[in-house]
Amino acid sequence: AFELFLANGVAATTIEEICEHADVANRTFFNHFATRQDMIRALAERRLVNLHDVVFDRADKAIPARLVGVFDDIAAALVGSGDTYREMIGEMLTISGYGIQRGSNLHDTFVELVKEGVARGEVSERHDAETLADIIVGALSGGIVNWTGDRTYSLETNLHNLGVALAELLTTSV
């Protein structure tokens, strides 16, 4: 389905085309996904699984620098992916609730990162990890949503600036 969405666009791709491409009957599709939105939500969750590895493959870097680097890498990957991918990401974010819910893979990745930073003495303890992860995920998804809806929004510049601001928030003490 992901390849079809990229080739044809999200709105133009039908469930029938997805079933034909996957060589499954419509009934089989609906046994797995109650709605088209459920399928897109599942695609979004699969795409986010790799983010955990991206974040934690940088174990040699301090947590604040790692956060900036991850935001930079996400921006570079998305900007280089083309307009159809931009549409697909926007649709995935909208349907998946922007991935900001506590307990989502995206949120849990950043909770783990913050806790690691606290344990290493690189992140301030003045706010709990869940709250800081809420802010990080909100900033990331907000930047991406702005990019999907505004062709003039510089994702690379703005995600970098968001990453830097978040790094300062994580380390600044009162």
Task: For each feature predicted by the language model, list its residue ranges.
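Hydrophobic alpha-helical connector segments
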Residues: A42, D53-D83, L132-I136, L159
